[in-house]
Each structure stands twice: as C-alpha cells, then as structure tokens.
Amino acid sequence: DATERQNTLLFLKEIYPTLKPFLRREGILAIENQGTSIVTDLGELETPLVNNSECAYLIFNENKTALCGIEEAYNKGIVTFNKPISCHLYPVRVKDYSEFAAVNYHRWDICSDACSLGKELKVPVYKFVKEALIRKFGEHWYSELEKVALEHLSQK
C-alpha cells in the first residue's frame, strides 16, 4: 500500500550511507545513477538493477553465494529494519486489487539455478518464502495456504 511504499522509500534513503561500504562497486554505481529505489509506471516499488540484471543491493559472501546486502546488514545489527517486503517475498509478487491480493510467482531466468535447486530439494516456492509470506499476511493466512497446497498436491 502507499504507506508501506513511502516507508520503504524513506528507509532505503536513510540506510544507504550505512550500507554503501558493504556493497559492490557496480551496485553503488547503479544506486547513485538510478536512486536508492525506483517506482515503476504502475506505482510499484523496485530496487535499482545493475545492467538490467541483478539487484544493486546484491552482495556475495566468501563462498561466492549471492546475498541481499540489506538483509545481511539487518542480520548483523547494522540496520534495524529488514529488507523491503517486496524483496523478501521475491520471486513471489503481490498485486493488490480492491477486493483481494493476487499472489503470483515471477519467473526470471536469472533465478533458474535457485529454481533448479528448489526442485531438487523438493522445496516449493511458497515454503521458500514462508517467513516473508507470514510477515506480509500473518501466521493464520500461511497455515491456510499450507492446507490448500496439501489438498492440491493430494489430488495430483
């Protein structure tokens, strides 16, 4: 909603100076050229991208595993607010309508390795983003989702 979007915009502007030393050079360039966040033509909030590819806040740990720089700073106590809910939910996208919220999977080739691993480990997308779905919709909503998913899978 508009309040959540405004809070996220302010949050990203506020924490950027603290995050900057931890970010990759190409991420810093993308942020400084595009801003700490972008509002699309549809009014949706997105993080800036490096060359229309990965998120500008993406970092790599010593094992070359891709991580969210905002989430890492939060986990280390450097910032007090976790990454934006839209990032936390990804690859799930939520589109709010007047009567309901549509929850959809966003397929992007940049995420194909993660999808392959999820398939191999038998971790469906909704379980992968469980914490984020609970953060967005609450425990009760998520438990209802699990029931529906089990029912759906039992019919296959």
Language-model-detected regions and their locations in the chain:
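Short loop/turn segments that flank or connect secondary-structure elements
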Residues: D1-K156
